[in-house]
């Protein structure tokens, strides 16, 4: 009796093929789903910045929310290949000046001034909780 033609091998092969047919598309599509989630998270953060009524400080100069979002979008385009998580986006595109190293700050409606990193990480956490 050949092993390759035995009933047990045929059953195992059949089970493996069935598994691949049923679960293969989901497994193969996972990276695309991850990229889609990353894109959605980043777009949410950019919209969050743009639609806020906050003032942004970059190198000690005040900017509108729209200007801040546009600046972050440009930095995102420059670092796209290095950004694998929303936290990477915040760290690379929305935290500090590449030239001076100075942190970005956000002046909230109540006058409190916090780093853009802390503000955006909090916004990201809220977004994730709402996605559950």
Could you tell me what each predicted segment is?
Residues 1-6, 30, 49:
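Short linear motifs in intrinsically disordered/low-complexity regions
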Residues 2-16:
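Bacterial N-terminal signal peptides that target proteins for export
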Residues 14-26:
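Bacterial N-terminal signal peptides
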Residues 26-34:
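Sec/Tat signal peptide C-region and signal peptidase I cleavage site
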Residues 60-132:
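Compact alpha-helical subdomains of small soluble proteins
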